[in-house]
Each structure stands twice: as structure tokens, then as C-alpha cells.
């Protein structure tokens, strides 16, 4: 796993607003605090989120974009891209792969952080079908698409040269290979999560559950008790 001093730019690709904050906001805060430029790429606007049928889906999408932008600022991220694919219907097709490849070539990151394309049966809520599809498309965009000059020639016509990503960090993978100690930034993680007001009917309960989960993972991974970690399956891509 590359260290913050070895990373200049990192691209986060997630299916929905709030996904990065649940899984990785502590890591993002750690990286931005070390001077890494982080960009968020959200595949959908999250317009299928929530259960209030009196609110239009367009209004939900606008609200969730605002919530994600606010949450991003808490952890030092100001560069966000919303791809606008339909929430609940994400498909890892060539259209999405091209869209993500475009962002990779624009950002030119050393690391792409995305959701695991493999279902985690121990954490089924982290394996929403949109998450799996977004992860699948992001991994395919890293290899082979974004580095291949003959994949999506329209990107060359846009002036976007191929780019080779060094590592992929998969969140919510069934098996984590590496862990980031986010204890110093744990409060900022939950401050970011609390920006997603429309999705959190019980923010206090959510925070307690995640603190318990993250501290238990830390002990299992060999960290001192009282430490909080976020886990990733790191894939070498170059």
C-alpha cells in the first residue's frame, strides 16, 4: 500500500453520495492532511435514496449532491464529479467504463479507491448491486481502459492521453489486505457522515455502531485497543 508521501493524487470512485464517507472518510482525511489531492467521482446522484415519496426524485438528487459536497469539504475535498448514472440501475457497461476512464485521464491519479466488485456476505449492506457494478467498472477502467490508447478513441480526441494507475484500493472487500489508522481523524469522519441528513434517521446510533465495528477491526488487525481503522484490499495495477 502506497504511503501518503508516495501519492500526489488519488481518485475515489463510488456509486452513491455517502458511500465514501461510510467506508473511507477517515482515510481521505488522513491523505488530504498529508497534502494528497483527492477527487471524488460519484457514479449516481443517489436519487433513489430515502423513503419519502412526497419529495421528487430530482429534489432528492439535488439535496444529495449538496450533502456530499458538504461532507467532502469536511475531509478536505473540493473536487467532485457527478456522472449522473441512474441510481439503483448501475451497470458496468462500456458507457460507464468510458466515463470513469475519462475522469482517470483527467485526474491522473497514482491510486484509485473504489468499491469491491466482489460481494461481501458478512457485510451485505456494503454490497449493494450498484456498489458491485461501480467497483467492477472502476477496476476495468484502471485496467485496461485508461492506459490503452485504443480503448475509447474519443478520449484521445478530447485531448486525454492514457494514464497508468499504480494501485487500486478496494473498500468493503471480503478480505482486507491493508488497514489505515484513522484514529486521529475519526471525529471528522463522523462529522462528514452527519452531513448526509437525508439518509440518517439515527445518526447517533450509526456512529456508535461504526465506532464499535472500526475498533473491533483494529484489534483483529493487530492494532492497539482504542484505535480505529479502515480496511482495504490493495491491488497492484502497474
Please describe what each predicted stretch is:
Residues 1-11, 93-238:
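Metal-dependent de-N-acetylase/amidase catalytic core
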Residues 1-108, 233:
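Active-site rim/loop-helix segments in enzyme catalytic domains that contact anionic ligands
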Amino acid at each position: 500500500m502506497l504511503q501518503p508521501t508516495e501519492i500526489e493524487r488519488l481518485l475515489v470512485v463510488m456509486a452513491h453520495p455517502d458511500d465514501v464517507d461510510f467506508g473511507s472518510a477517515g482515510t481521505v482525511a488522513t491523505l488530504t492532511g498529508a497534502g494528497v489531492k483527492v477527487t471524488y467521482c460519484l457514479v449516481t446522484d443517489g436519487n433513489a435514496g430515502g423513503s419519502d415519496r412526497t419529495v421528487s426524485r430530482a429534489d432528492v438528487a439535488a439535496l444529495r449532491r449538496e450533502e456530499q459536497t458538504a461532507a467532502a469539504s469536511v475531509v478536505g475535498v473540493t473536487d467532485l464529479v457527478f456522472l449522473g448514472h441512474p441510481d439503483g440501475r448501475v451497470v458496468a457497461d462500456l458507457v460507464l467504463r468510458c466515463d470513469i476512464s475519462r475522469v482517470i485521464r483527467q485526474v491522473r491519479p497514482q491510486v484509485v479507491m473504489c468499491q469491491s466488485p466482489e460481494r461481501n456476505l458478512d457485510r451485505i449492506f456494503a454490497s449493494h448491486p450498484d456498489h458491485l457494478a461501480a467497483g467492477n467498472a472502476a477496476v476495468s477502467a484502471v485496467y485496461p481502459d485508461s492506459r490503452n490508447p485504443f480503448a475509447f478513441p474519443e478520449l484521445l480526441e478530447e485531448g486525454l492521453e492514457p494514464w497508468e494507475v499504480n494501485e487500486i484500493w478496494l473498500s468493503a472487500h471480503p478480505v482486507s489486505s491493508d488497514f489505515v489508522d484513522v484514529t486521529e481523524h475519526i471525529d471528522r469522519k463522523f462529522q462528514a457522515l452527519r452531513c448526509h441528513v437525508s439518509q440518517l434517521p439515527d445518526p447517533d446510533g450509526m456512529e456508535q455502531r461504526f465506532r464499535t465495528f472500526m475498533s473491533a477491526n483494529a484489534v483483529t488487525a493487530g492494532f492497539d485497543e482504542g484505535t480505529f481503522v479502515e480496511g482495504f484490499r490493495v491491488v497492484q495495477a502497474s
